[in-house]
């Protein structure tokens, strides 16, 4: 999160005003023995509705993300949370096949 906060400050300095934050992604199956079940996938935002969906190896809490959005607003940067589907939705199918 500290990287994103610093990025917003730098963007503001350079008069950039929109940041897409990519919240889900997955690897390519050919790098995981051509097996989708072994392919890395993650959803990086805390979900109380679907608690098993949130990545175990690192994620943003709702409060943390809201604070980040408020900071960005102070610097004139709009945060657009990006949920990339259907292309990078392996985290969803791992959660609920």
Residue locations for each model-derived region?
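Substrate-binding cleft of carbohydrate-active enzyme catalytic domains
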Residues: 1-97
């Amino acid at each position: 999160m500290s990287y994103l906060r610093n990025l917003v400050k730098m963007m503001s300095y350079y008069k950039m005003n929109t940041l897409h934050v990519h919240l889900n992604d997955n690897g390519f199956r050919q790098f995981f023995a051509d097996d989708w079940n072994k392919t890395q996938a993650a959803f990086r935002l805390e979900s109380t509705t679907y608690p098993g969906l949130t990545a175990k190896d690192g994620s943003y809490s709702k409060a943390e993300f809201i604070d980040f959005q408020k900071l960005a607003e102070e610097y004139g940067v709009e945060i657009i949370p990006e949920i990339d589907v259907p292309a990078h939705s392996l985290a969803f199918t791992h959660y609920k096949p």
